[in-house]
Amino acid sequence: MSMFCYQCQEASQGIGCTVRGVCGKTDDVANLQDLLIFTLKGISFLNLKARETGVNKEKTDRFLFEGLFSTITNVNFDRNFFINKIKEAVALREEIKEDLKKAGIEVDESCEAIHWVYDTDEDIEAIAAEVGVLSTKDEDIRSLRELITYGVKGMAAYAYHAYQLGYKDDNIFRFMEKALAKVLDDSLTADDYVALALEAGKYGVDTMALLDKANTSTYGHPEITKVNIGVRNNPGILISGHDLKDLEQLLEQTAGTGVDVYTHGEMLPAHYYPAFKKYPHFVGNYGNAWWQQDREFELFNGPILMTTNCLVPPKDSYKDRVYTTGVVGFEGVKYIPEGPDGKKDFSEIIEHAKRCKPPVEIERGEIIGGFAHNQVLELADKIVEAVKTGAIKRFFVMAGCDGRMKSRTYYTEFAKALPKDTVILTAGCAKYRYNKLNLGDINGIPRVLDAGQCNDSYSLAVIAMKLKEVFGLNDINKLPISYNIAWYEQKAVIVLLALLYLGVKNIHLGPTLPAFLSPNVTKVLVDKFGIGGITNVEDDMKMFMGE
C-alpha cells in the first residue's frame, strides 16, 4: 500500500510523504484518514440540505469537528480508530439521507462521497486508497481544495475546544459543511476556490473569537504571569496538548493527592489564566515544544496525558506512561474516555503517578507570558507612548508552530539579531525558539509578548486592529508590524487564512512554504497578498527593516 500526504510543513522532500509520514503515521492510516475526510465531505453535502429543512441534528456537528480534528497532524495514529470512525460516518450519512427522504427531499446520488458502501474492512481500505489528495487531477484545483480543507481542519479543532466549554455557533458549522461540500464540486473554478479560501479566513476569525470567548468566560482573561520551569520533589503528571477543560478536571481530581501537575508544549499558556492559579499543585511547565517530547517524556518519570496534538509515536521506554483522551490515539496506549455526563475519570493516571519517581530537573528558572489582547490593551497607553517616542520602532509577529527541521534555528537567531527597539508578538509553540532567551525589555515592556496557544493568534489580530484604531490608520499594513511566521500543521493554515481575510499583507512563512501550494497558487498568493518565504537572518532582517 502507498500513501500521499502533504498537509504538514515536514512533507518529505518538500513534496509529500508516500511510504510513511515523517510524523510517523503509516500508509494505511494516512489512507483511512483520506477516506474519513471524503466521507465527511459527503455528510457535509447532505447536512447542508438537512439544515435548510430543520432536520439537522447537533450530533452531526460534533461528529464533523471531531472527525476533522482526528486527522490533523500528530493527533491520531490508530488504524482501528479510523476504521471504526469511518463506519460511524457511513451510518450517520445514511441516517441523514433517511431523514431527508422522510422530509421529502431528494438527494443527488451521483456524488461518490454520498453513496460509497462497504462489506468488509478490506473494502474500506481498498476504497481509502482511491479517494486521497491525488484523486483531483488538476494541480491548481487540488492545491486550492487542500488549502481550504486544511483550513477547515484547523477551524474544526478550535470549534471542538469551544464546544467542550459549552460554546458553539451554527454559522461556523454551516460554513464548514459548505466548504467541504464545495471541494467536491467539479464545476468550481480556481477563482471560486480563492474566494472560498478567503471566506474560510472570515470564519477562522469567528471561530478563534468564539474560542477566546469560551476560554476567557470560563477561566478569566490571561494576565502577566511568571511560570516556573523547574521541578519539585513530588510525583507528577505531565499534561500536553491544548484542552483546558481536561486540565481543569485533572487539577480538581489531583488536589490533595500529593501528585503535582506540569504543563508541556502548548499547554504552557494555561498558567496565564486566573482560574488555574488557585491550585497549589499546579507547579509549572516542563520541557519545550512537542518535537522534543521523546527525551522530555523519558526524563519526566511520571505519566503523560495527551489531550490533543502533538503526539509523537512514543518510545517503548515510556509508552506505558502515555495516556490519550479526546480524539488522540495511538495503538497500545491507554485511552481515557468521556463519561455520559461529559466528565472524565482520571483516577487511573493519578494512581499511576503515585507509583512514579519525581521528574528529573532539566532546567530551572521562570518564563513570562500572559500577553493576550485584554492584558496588552491594559498596557496600551504605555505601548503607544513607546511607539510615539521611538522607544519601540517595530513589532514582529513570530507566532506559529515549532518543528523538528534543523533550519528552524533560524527563528532563534532571528530573535537574537532583532534590534533592541523591537518587540516580538507570539502565540503557539513557535515561542519555544526564543522565550527563554534574555532579550530584555523596553521601558518595562518585555521584548517577547506571549499571547498563548496557537489559537491566541486571534489576540495578536485584535491588538493590531486596536493599534490601527489608536494611530488613526485606514490600513492595518501601515502599522510598524512585520509578520515572520513559522508554520507546521493545519491550525496554522486557518490562522494564515484569517490574517489574509483581515487584510494583512507581506506575511513571510517558514521554514518552507507549504508543499500543497502549487506554483500557480503560490503566485496568486504572492501577487495578491505579498506572501513570501524566508532566506537567511541577515538578508531577511534587512528586508524587514527596510534597509
UniProtKB/Swiss-Prot annotation:
Record keyword Transmembrane helix present: no
Ranges in coiled-coil conformation: none
Transmembrane regions listed in the UniProt entry: none
Annotated cofactor note: Binds 1 [4Fe-4S] cluster.
Key words of the record: 4Fe-4S, Cytoplasm, Iron, Iron-sulfur, Metal-binding, Oxidoreductase
Biological process terms in GO annotation: response to hydrogen peroxide
Residues at which [4Fe-4S] cluster binds: 5, 8, 17, 23
CDD domains given in the database record: HCP (cd01914)
Binding residues for hybrid [4Fe-2O-2S] cluster: 242, 266, 310, 401, 429, 454, 489, 491
EC code(s) of this entry: 1.7.99.1
Residues with the Cysteine persulfide modification: 401
Entries under PANTHER family matching the protein: HYDROXYLAMINE REDUCTASE
Listed NCBIfam families: hybrid_clust, PRK05290.1
Family recorded in the similarity comment: Belongs to the HCP family.
Function of the protein: Catalyzes the reduction of hydroxylamine to form NH(3) and H(2)O.
HAMAP family, A to Z: Hydroxylam_reduct (MF_00069)
Designated name of the protein: Hydroxylamine reductase
Species of provenance: Thermoanaerobacter pseudethanolicus (strain ATCC 33223 / 39E) (Clostridium thermohydrosulfuricum)
